[in-house]
Amino acid sequence: MDKIVLTGGGTGGHVYPNLALIPSLQQEGFEVVYVGGEGDTIERRLTSPLGIEYHSLPVVKLVRGLSLKAVKNNLSIPIVLTRSIINAKKLLKQIEPSLIFAKGGYVSLPLILAHGKTPLVCHESDLSFGLANKIGKLMGGRMLTSNPATKGECVGIPLRQELFSKNKVTARRGLNIPQNDRVLLVMGGSSGATALNNAVVKHLSTLTKSFTVVHLYGNKNYTPPKRTDKYIPLPYADDMASLYAVSDVVLSRAGATAVAELSALCKKALFVPLPKGVSRGDQLDNALLAKSMGGRVLYEDNLDNLPEEIDKTLHSPPMKSTYGDTNGKIVAVIRDSISRGEKCKNKKQSQNGLP
């Protein structure tokens, strides 16, 4: 049985597409192994219930900016990364996978750098390549993309099938939300979003006049107001299918996976992209893509207009779905890449006179 190593983590956008692929890979007879970061990471927590083999490597995220904290963090990267690459090489020798599928982000970088002769497939959800995938391309990885405008093989973004499994009535019963209420779902991303969280709280009295607000505020150092009948704060939700099902409007950061999920579900959505100062600008690109699919966009410097923009979104058409058989396309690429790797290996053995 061929083993596939999936790697990626740190945020939901680098984990959920991998989770979406796992059932398809298992149905095709592959054994799946996940490699993520050390400690209580989102990738460890989300893969744990699946019962798949999990291995961890030491990783450090690049922090943008020139603050003392950022400088101290970034100075540790060469030391931690070197140790991680050494560990990754040992791990690959132990696992002997047929292929590595890297979802980008700093968690995937050690395996990208250590992959050696193991076939490498990298997937980029954003319109522009992140640093890890840029390195993956230089290291000979096969590049898959979510958009035809991005250089590579366009396959789309893998989406979890369970997202399509819930209906509004049943989901509202399960969450004790009245059937006639309008529901606003706020998603700041798995790491939270301080500016978005603060804007929601600032306008909460206005928003709760029109909506029951379900607020996914993230886990990082944020204390939301107390729960009421019209305000439901949650640090995180494993059952996103139910939350999507109950919502009439979604307020979200413009992560590529969030854009893909909300368009596939034909939701009414307002996106607040991360500004370029705290990111490489990928969410600004994603927001423009979302707008072309019927989503609305509000930039951080206009968050004072949040209630009005949410109301406009409520009375706008839903997003248009462009969802296709992404999983099938990726599984086909994986099979082809394994086959190419085996042919290359056999050719070299033949040239060297080996059986």
Residue spans for each PLM region:
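Donor-nucleotide binding loops and adjacent catalytic segments primarily
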Residues: 40-46, 50, 65, 168-173, ...
